Amino acid sequence: EEAMPSAWPCCDECGTCTRMIPPRCTCMDVSPSGCHPACKNCVQTTLGGRDVFWCMLRIENFCKRRCTPAR
């Protein structure tokens, strides 16, 4: 499920985080329609044979808030 968050930063699938306080994390979320406008490093890649976009920033508390409700 790809979701374009309205409030940013948010992340459903957290990547790696630093040990700093607060932690600076990457997010593994991808979207077929592009990154959030605030993302300054949006990369287009292929996943499962389709083009997707991934924000490759390391942001403080990136994984603190989900973009979509937890299941």
Curated annotation (Swiss-Prot):
Sites marked Reactive bond for trypsin: 19-20
Functional summary from the UniProt entry: Inhibits trypsin but not chymotrypsin.
Similarity remark: Belongs to the Bowman-Birk serine protease inhibitor family.
One Gene Ontology term, aspect cellular component: extracellular region
Gene Ontology MF terms in the entry: serine-type endopeptidase inhibitor activity
Record Pfam families: Bowman-Birk_leg
Disulfide bond sites: 10-67, 11-27, 14-63, 17-25, 35-42, 39-55
Protein name (Swiss-Prot/TrEMBL): Bowman-Birk type trypsin inhibitor
The entry's keywords: Disulfide bond, Protease inhibitor, Serine protease inhibitor
Organism annotation: Triticum aestivum (Wheat)
Entries under SMART domains matching the protein: BowB (SM00269)
